[in-house]
Amino acid sequence: LEKSRREEQMKRIEKGTPGYLDYKKKVEIIRTVIYFLLVAAIFTLGYVQTKTRSNLLTVVAILGCLPAAKALVGVITRFPYASVDQKLVHEVTKAPHTTRVYDLVLTTREKIMPVECVVISNGTVFGYTDSKKVDLNVLSKHIRDMMTQNRLSYSTVKFYQDYKVFLSRIEGLESIAMVENAKINGEEEAQTRQLLLNLSM
């Protein structure tokens, strides 16, 4: 039972699904530790064999610091952001006729903007972030601009920091989708979801 539990914990979580950010942080922490241990092992081996730091393995160890440092930057960048709360996931799951994406960390040249959830349905995009540091106008404009560049047309793109307001908007989207009984723009919604994933760390 314990073995199966550990295997379940290490099971790959796809980008855009609940739990991805926490999973990705664990993977990158493990990868970073392994990289630095390998660098240390290579350097130590070279020093033990030659009794000097001026050897080929030292050069290899120095070069190995580059991917190790890159992995460390990934850990540091993602570390402040946690996966979406399961309570929100449970509430949004009540809108099964919509397209959903979770655990986003959207980036521009100047900003890093965490977004817990985005719901897409029939020409409308609603998103939620609990970070008060995120400028909602900047975030909405960035997503609209990216959609325009990718020839995706939406009448409404809006993000919220108010949990209850966001849920009420999602409830409204679900009601409309249920009445229509089908996704009018299913392919475009899938493309929009993929765009958001591409824009996210």
Predicted regions: what they are:
Residues 2-99, 139-141, 148-155, 162-201:
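Surface-exposed interaction regions that form or flank ligand-binding interfaces
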Residues 97-115:
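Active-site metal-binding core of divalent-cation-utilizing nuclease and nuclease-like domains
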Residues 102, 127, 159-161:
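Structural signal for conserved beta-strand scaffold positions within catalytic alpha/beta enzyme cores
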Residues 115-126:
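Active-site beta-strand-loop-beta-strand hairpin of nuclease catalytic cores
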Residues 129-134:
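Short beta-strand-loop-alpha-helix junction that forms the active-site gateway
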